[in-house]
Amino acid sequence: SVNTVSVLFMINYAINWFLNPLIGRTINRIGERKLLSIEYSTAILVFTGYATTGSAWVAGVLYVIDYIVFNFSIALRTFFQKIAEPQDIAPTMAVAQTINHIAAIFVPALGGWLWVEFGYQIPFFIGAALSGCSLLLVQIIDREIRLHAPAKA
């Protein structure tokens, strides 16, 4: 219902108002690889939960968890700033933003089609699988940071 969604939005905004400053400090403390590993591991569990739960309450809790860990993606930007040449940051971020906007149009349409044709579980299982791929890929982050770090004299 509209009331339920409104309450979920208010819960998310209140929680993230407190947690977002902690995310930056957490990146500094544990690093991008570990924080993104937590994000993608949690996303696997959340998407699998969405696909398998029959409870609206569980789905609501999963939504709040999903919203919290989605903000961990700031670690992608801090990682990029560590490995990119300064003159490449702005144009690369602009292209990434454009690609994200294009995906924001096509991915929901594809997900909706999969939902209608094959059941609501399929888009969430695909999301879990893609999160698994991302989890594997972020394991090379520390190596990339070391490769791009300035040499110490």
List the predicted regions and their residue ranges:
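Multi-pass alpha-helical transporter architecture, strongest
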Residues: 127-153
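Helix-to-loop junctions at the C-terminal end of transmembrane segments
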Residues: 19-31, 115-116
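Residue-level signature of mid-helix packing/kink "hotspots" within the transmembrane helices
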Residues: 13-21, 71, 101-105, 109
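A membrane-interface helix-boundary motif in multi-pass transporters
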Residues: 113-131
